[in-house]
Amino acid sequence: MKFAPILLASAASAHTIFSSLEVNGVNHGVGGGVRVPSYNGPIENVDSASIACNGAPNPTTPTSKVITVQAGQNVTAIWRYMLSTTGSAPNDIMDISHKGPTMAYLKKVNDATTDSGVGGGWFKIQEDGYNNGVWGTEKVINGQGRHSIKIPSCIAPGQYLLRAEMLALHGAGNYPGAQFYMECAQLNIVGGTGSKTPSTVAFPGAYSGSHPGVKISIYWPPVTNYQIPGPSVFTC
């Protein structure tokens, strides 16, 4: 695959940001309840505290807004290349070379505006890997940057952090190389039954640099089966 190095070089700066959250058809605006960074670069060290909700080298901006969401409904994370990007064409989202899975996690917290997200309590509620030759990131890139996430109906009500993530594997043949893009939204989830308690993981800790879903060549040999990193998806 002689073209791969050229492809990687040309796409090296094609990053992305989870910039806003849409609930019930209402977009809460860039940085409205989402801790957006000042730079759109990735986190590559899975052992960094920044793997939780982003951070150094991408300082995030605090927000006092907490978005109320009904348990059981779908919300939409909106991804854009930069905070100032207004379009929704594929190039406005992330370079198409950035192929990999999408994921989403929740963490129950006492105060969504102050909890750093670092540490335990996280459970996965969505993932989309490699299916029928199409990556989860491709669906978001070609779908106007829309990343649909269902909030479980059976969790306890209260404040949560929602961690939406896209993982780009174009340079993941060695570790570090995989590019993790994530931000955290601040939610107040209402109407949950609290009938099930999810098993949880920690960030950092949920991912390993040696995991086959983190260290993988997606160019050669051709990918036939992909193992998404992290825990299984929590279901009610």
Swiss-Prot record:
It comes from Podospora anserina (strain S / ATCC MYA-4624 / DSM 980 / FGSC 10383) (Pleurage anserina). PANTHER family: ENDOGLUCANASE II (PTHR33353:SF18), PUTATIVE (AFU_ORTHOLOGUE AFUA_1G12560)-RELATED (PTHR33353). Belongs to the polysaccharide monooxygenase AA9 family. Disulfide bonds join 154-236. Its EC number is 1.14.99.56. InterPro entries: AA9, AA9_LPMO. This is AA9 family lytic polysaccharide monooxygenase G. It is found in: Secreted. Keywords: Carbohydrate metabolism, Cellulose degradation, Copper, Disulfide bond, Glycoprotein, Metal-binding, Monooxygenase, Oxidoreductase, Polysaccharide degradation, Secreted, Signal. Cu(2+) binds at residues 15, 98, 181.
